[in-house]
Amino acid sequence: MNKKQKVYVGVSGGVDSSVALALLKEQGYDVTGVFLRVWQADFLPCDWKEERRSAMRVCATLGVPFITLDCQEEYKKEVVDYMIAEYSAGRVPNPDVFCNKFVKFGVFLKKALEMGADFIATGHYARKFSLAHSSASGLYPLSGGSDDTSASECAQENFFQLCESVDLNKDQSYFLYTLNQHQLSHTLFPVGHFTKPEVRKLAKKFGLSTAEKKDSQGLCFIGKVDMKDFLKHFIQSKEGDVLNTKGEVIGRHDGAIFYTIGQRHGFDVIKKSSESGASFVVSKDIEKNTITVEDRESERNTTYSTKEIILKNINFISGVEPGFPLKAQVRIRYRQEKQSCVVLKTGESYKIIFDAPQSGVAIGQSAVLYDGEICLGGGIIDVA
């Protein structure tokens, strides 16, 4: 009799990871629920204990083992410290990308394999495919459309593709572009073939207490926190001028580093100006500590749009660089509609040229490349 394959499932206390655990148990895997304990600032509510209890209840309902894995050191160093350093330098990092890279698919995967697991699994909305099951007319999932790849298949089918989930509104491939072939070969995405409503129905079917639980939002693992308030505990704030696109002072802000290009913000607007209410940040000058805003309802100001960006590095999930120039699609922010582009290699860096000008490009954010539903990889925006 073949030994059951062992899967360590990252359980956060939410509905997606709970259903991932239940599905894999139903499919016959030897599953263990793993709660990742990460660093949390002492000034934040201590929510992790309740989330851990929620994850434990799910494991108890399903009758599967539960363990807690300490990832505090890695999370603090690779996610929080990096985020603070990037904001201090005037860039806008994406902590979820680094949480996936260094924590979920870094230390968690490493320790799971050391403890004898064949795979880890998460509640991410994404899908994994084998190149051997690709065809000119589309891509075919491993093992009849589910993430139940066997270890023998992994040995034989050693090339994997990361694809968007069935539920495009929930798709998280944007945050997973740093994955490599080794990580993908040992990772399962059980909920990637379902829509969110279907996942909630499955949670009810399995009798899980998380079935009606609201989706988590905000910073990876920490939850919904005001980023500006969070950063002010680590970075000194300094007031500066808010400018309109004519260079006129129209208000005051509490620190240029706290604001993100393209995002909607409210400011204390000087009454003598015609501008009022919420505006969109189109540029910021860290040295002068000024930010420039425009009203997106007015005629779009093309001065702050760009046709190209530069990335220092690109992680190609395949492990092999494609030929250049490369025609592809790209997202420069989460849930953005994919934009047609051409990728060029210029020395040690990469240039992405958009078919149409893009506004709201933030240095430090991720540009993620696609070929249709296939996530090719991506990198950090260095110049825009």
Question: Which residues are covered by each model-predicted region?
Answer:
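AMP-forming adenylation/ATP pyrophosphatase catalytic core
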Residues: 121-127, 142, 157-384
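ATP-dependent adenylation/nucleotidyltransferase module used to activate substrates
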Residues: 1-177, 188
